[in-house]
Amino acid sequence: MKMVSLIALLVFATGAQAAPIASKAPAHQPTGSDLPPLPAAAPVAPAAQPSAQAVDPASAAPASDAGSASNADAILDNAENAAGVGTDVATVHTYSLQELGAQSALTMRGAAPLQGLQFGIPADQLVTSARLVVSGAMSPNLQPDNSAVTITLNEQYIGTLRPDPTHPAFGPLSFDINPIFFVSGNRLNFNFASGSKGCADPTNGLQWASVSEHSQLQITTIPLPPRRQLARLPQPFFDKTVRQKVVIPFVLAQTFDPEVLKASGIIASWFGQQTDFRGVNFPVFSTIPQTGNAIVVGVADELPAALGRPSVSGPTLMEVANPSDPNGTVLLVTGRDRDEVITASKGIGFGSSALPVASRMDVAPIDVAPRLANDAPSFIPTSRPVRLGELVPVSALQGEGYTPGVLSVPFRVSPDLYTWRDRPYKLNVRFRAPDGPILDVARSHLDVGINNTYLQSYSLREQSSVVDQLLRRVGVGTQNAGVEQHTLTIPPWMVFGQDQLQFYFDAAPLAQPGCRPGPSLIHMSVDPDSTIDLSNAYHITRMPNLAYMASAGYPFTTYADLSRSAVVLPDHPNGTVVSAYLDLMGFMGATTWYPVSGVDIVSADHVSDVADRNLIVLSTLSNSADVSALLANSAYQISDGRLHMGLRSTLSGVWNIFQDPMSVMSNTHPTEVETTLSGGVGAMVEAESPLASGRTVLALLSGDGQGLDNLVQILGQRKNQAKVQGDLVLAHGDDLTSYRSSPLYTVGTVPLWLIPDWYMHNHPFRVIVVGLVGCLLVVAVLVRALFRHAMFRRRQLQEERQKS
């Protein structure tokens, strides 16, 4: 029966045809799509370039190289999945290319003929049909006979776009896609072949083609039967090939139980580590959702009645069917008592690589070594130079074509770095470009930048001396022949929590005599042995600064397991507050790539038990009476269900200017504000802890709880991180307002010899005061010396008079 289903699907697939011009424009794409929006990825070059001619997709033979062979295996696996498909209702998803990651239109030129996007299909879904609807424009200077844009999916031919000089704009054009072409990770490529009269010049700006970012990909899927295997985690809750924001429901029997919440936080941070930049949300329920997947955490005797009473003999992980949805999976994290529940959660957080290919596992006790300061796995070390090959795969440092696009190297650092007199960091760049008479060296260069800020440009090939050329010809050249090497500096202010090095190759082909064509495809790369060196930095900074929290979870992530931090919750938190707590732990896990096994959960009555820790307070204003004392060192107060921001006195203003001279310009908003934080408005306040100097209190507050979730989500959104500044942020949706009013304090240490520089750094008032004091001391010393000299001369004169 399985073979019959497979043959039937293959017969259906071979009958798919490319549709001609669509009869009408595609439907308007809604703002909130149910498909995974993916970040733009570098185009992936197919192993064998397909023909630019328009042919029947069903008759186009796939490439025969190794890449196509592995692709074909994945396609056959996709077809075989059809044998287990039930009669579930199909779901139609609609992507725009912009949702798939295209920041703007995909523009192809002769020097950069390939553009593409990467997207995933969840492993528990099977594609039954798909269609690509494209629109765009092509240069009127292109020759229709030898110019085209070829569309491929996973190296399988989809269709061809040809120019019409009289009508440069095209579309919408519709192409049916054979569903057998889809795999878990897919590559949609647009390959441009240009032709013109006379000699072909790849750098000719008049030869181009553009595909609109509003083009659409429509996919119809049906669910596959669930496979409940712990080894598949994080599936089915999250599929790494689908780069979308993740929603994972949690079911907790009790709204406040410190041990159960700690276990839930460990699991949430592990899922945050897996989702990384995508973000994750954990809605909290008291009962199992009617459909889909969920995670249930609690003691076995307190689990929801719908699950029965599973028999456990210790810490246990178990996957069972959703009682209301046979396609849904419920992950049970349980044990006979609360300590065993925490142990079971560590089985996921620290033992995921050893999870079995089974639906149940008894978890053995796990000993976790304490973390050291600033050793989060996601932060690059500041004790040595770091190779770029340690940060990204070698393939991410390679480019094809004359202008292969930006090669990005993301990295993270603790944002509290400080260097003596703002000494810059060092970046050693090594790169390779083609040898021989291929490139016009005078016009070819590599641009280096960081966080979208330009740093330096270098020629792809420095002029070699005659001796070097002769040695290279006889095969005794230098060991690094063909590798260009340069060292540049990065100002410290350009480096913060989440960073990205950017390399952009811009090569120009060398004009060939007699209209001879040069190579159509060249390879250039940044050497993985290139290094970035932050070893001249020390860990010290001035707080409060919510920008550090938004970019790297600082100061709480100084210890990756949050062992120097505690979370303060109300005595009886509602589901919204608990959900915000889990979302925050997910954010911490995504920031450090480490589970939060060291964090403590306390109520406001037990804050004294964690007085020596950094504190995170999650509360509504109605429940904040017990935690208002924790903001004693801030300029803000909570009383009568309102957040007050008092007007600073003249004396305090002068003192703040002496502490931070930039505070005069940093806050342009009124300093006297009063708000109830209602209607979804949330407040994020940071100040020094009144319980221990050098410790931080971060309070996330909302009038009714609705704003708490929005505050945590803002922390994970890169587009809003730049708006999070100062010591207070008021948030209503994406509308953020920042304030700076509270006194500053220092977190971290530096060597003794660096203390004067740290104390005077960016503080002209301190320099003036020290200068005046120094002048007074010098004058006092001189006056005393002159007085002593005068007294000495007086005695000498008196002695001479007596002798005479």
From Swiss-Prot:
Pathway(s) the chain acts in: Glycan metabolism; bacterial cellulose biosynthesis
Major location category of this protein: membrane
Signal peptide stretch: 1-18
Membrane topology: Single-pass type I membrane protein
InterPro entries: Cell_synth_B, Cell_synthase_bac
Membership in a protein family: Belongs to the AcsB/BcsB family.
Subunit structure: Tightly associated with the cellulose synthase catalytic subunit.
Protein name: Cyclic di-GMP-binding protein
Organism (species): Komagataeibacter xylinus (Gluconacetobacter xylinus)
Gene designation: bcsBI
